[in-house]
Amino acid sequence: MAAGTSNYWEDLRKQARQLENELDLKLVSFSKLCTSYSHSSTRDGRRDSSDTTPLLNGSSQDRMFETMAIEIEQLLARLTGVNDKMAEYTNSAGVPSLNAALMHTLQRHRDILQDYTHEFHKTKANFMSIRERENLMGSVRKDIESYKSGSGVNNRRTELFLKEHDHLRNSDRLIEETISIAMATKENMTSQRGMLKSIHSKMNTLANRFPAVNSLIQRINLRKRRDSLILGGVIGICTILLLLYAFH
């Protein structure tokens, strides 16, 4: 019976790790899509403002965004379900020492799920903000072009407005590049943190699996501390005796 429940727990952990790996890859691609969206709009100068469908050039990216968002939401829901099953298992497990180790593993998976959920919503919000801004700026440029073609006069005010508009677009491009660098740095830090958590978890697992080794290490540390105290006391006494002898 214990072997069956142990296999059930290992199956849940395997499912959680597989879903976490899939989510990590999806979120990296999702972040790259968000970054490339603004860059492609900047290279085009506008999203085909002369067309009656201003989203035509970005329609493929919009469809890809919607598809990836749905896939990530489904993966997050599946991972949440696996975590809930792991929580039910830990509550029904009966051995206190084993239950503590399982709770530690469950909390680590919950932290990973929380990080992925936060990163997904943040990236999605950034994408929506970029798309709205690009649509707004494309509409402004379309109005300007319509005004120029209707009047047929390139007056000074219109030229200044266009220059200011281009300047704002260049500023937005620099800001987006800075954000992309920051997001890449965050991804690297998240990956390193995951590696450190994995190492810490393995060390705890080894310590729980081999309590005799853990007890031996503790006794060695206590003996080292005791020897250090004794050595310090001997050195202190010798120093006092030398000082008394020197000043006698």
UniProtKB/Swiss-Prot annotation:
Component of several multiprotein Golgi SNARE complexes. Identified in a SNARE complex with BET1, STX5 and YKT6, in a SNARE complex with BET1L, STX5 and YKT6, in a SNARE complex with STX5, GOSR2, SEC22B and BET1, and in complex with STX5 and COG3. Interacts with GABARAPL2. Belongs to the GOSR1 family. It comes from the Eukaryota. PANTHER family: GOLGI SNAP RECEPTOR COMPLEX MEMBER 1 (PTHR21094:SF2), GOS-28 SNARE- RELATED (PTHR21094). The chain crosses the membrane at residues 228-248. Residues 37-60 are annotated as: Disordered. One of its GO terms (molecular function) is SNAP receptor activity. Keywords: Acetylation, Coiled coil, ER-Golgi transport, Golgi apparatus, Membrane, Phosphoprotein, Protein transport, Transmembrane, Transmembrane helix, Transport. Residues 41-50 have a biased composition (Basic and acidic residues). The keyword Protein transport applies. CDD domains: SNARE_GS28. Involved in transport from the ER to the Golgi apparatus as well as in intra-Golgi transport. It belongs to a super-family of proteins called t-SNAREs or soluble NSF (N-ethylmaleimide-sensitive factor) attachment protein receptor. May play a protective role against hydrogen peroxide induced cytotoxicity under glutathione depleted conditions in neuronal cells by regulating the intracellular ROS levels via inhibition of p38 MAPK (MAPK11, MAPK12, MAPK13 and MAPK14). Participates in docking and fusion stage of ER to cis-Golgi transport. Its main location: Golgi. InterPro entries: Golgi_SNAP_su1. Residues 10-30, 68-92 form a coiled coil. This is Golgi SNAP receptor complex member 1. It is found in: Golgi apparatus membrane. Residues 2-227 are cytoplasmic. The keyword Amino-acid biosynthesis does not apply. Pfam families: V-SNARE_C. GO terms for biological process: endoplasmic reticulum to Golgi vesicle-mediated transport; inter-Golgi cisterna vesicle-mediated transport; protein transport; vesicle fusion. The modification N-acetylalanine is found at residue 2. The modification Phosphoserine is found at residue 139. It is a single-pass type IV membrane protein. GO terms for cellular component: cis-Golgi network; Golgi medial cisterna; Golgi membrane; SNARE complex.
